[in-house]
Regions:
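OB-fold ssDNA-binding interfaces and closely related basic DNA-contact patches used
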Residues: 1-119, 172, 176, 180-184, ...
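Compact mixed alphabeta submodule
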Residues: 93-204
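Acidic, low-complexity intrinsically disordered tails
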Residues: 206-208
Length: 208
């Protein structure tokens, strides 16, 4: 279908989900849907931008390093180590966003869930209140403190229910690449290291 000139965006529109941005001090989110277990490597891309490459040695379903699939990042960069990178979706500011979890924060949420129940349940779940606190001068000197006394069961509102009516699984939001696709991407990054930035490479890391 053709559209009017003043309606065009001039380029293909991407249907992707924003990521939640942690802020200093108080944070509040409502976790929804399923959780994605994964480990990632971080590689320098164009313009020095860090890009996440999923560790294919790690099995999402088993939550274990099974080494079933070929891990091309380990082959190309044996000095690199992968890091914990679990994620889930959340409702924040009237939108569904991807919440890239912090390990210590998730551990606190899991302890609280023993008493409060599943935080993702639409009817009996609860809002996650926590603080982000600087503990030193370096970027990594940060602590996440769950405010358990503020976390109370609350059913989702009608508007929130509408937001998650067609919620995707995290396996769709952050798709797992095949070993061949990952190798191709690594090769493209190598070849493009001395060339102009290739937007198609960066596009591979967009959240769907």
């Amino acid at each position: 279908m053709a559209i009017k000139f003043n309606q065009t965006k001039g380029e293909a529109q991407k249907n992707k989900i924003d990521s939640y941005q942690y802020v200093e001090g108080d944070n509040k989110v409502r976790m929804v849907g399923d959780m994605l277990p994964r480990y990632v490597y971080w590689l320098k891309g164009e313009n020095g931008k860090n890009l996440p490459f999923e560790c294919l040695s790690f099995d999402r379903d088993a939550e274990a390093f099974t080494n079933v699939e070929k891990d091309w990042v380990r082959e190309y960069h044996p000095e690199l180590k992968c890091g914990w990178s679990y994620a889930i979706q959340c409702i924040h500011d009237g939108k569904v966003k991807v919440l890239n979890l912090k390990k210590k924060l998730l551990e606190q949420i899991m302890v609280a869930a023993e008493d409060l129940g599943d935080p993702t349940d639409p009817e009996t779940g609860w809002d996650v209140y926590f603080k982000r606190v600087k503990t030193g001068p370096m970027a990594y000197n940060v602590e996440y403190q769950l405010q358990a006394l503020k976390c109370k069961p609350r059913a989702l509102t009608e508007d929130e229910q509408a937001l998650i009516a067609e919620l995707k699984s995290m396996d769709e939001v952050l798709t797992r690449p095949t070993p061949d696709a990952q190798k191709e991407l690594l090769d493209r990054l190598r070849e493009g290291a001395s060339n102009e930035p290739d937007e198609t490479v960066t596009d591979e890391f967009d959240i769907k």
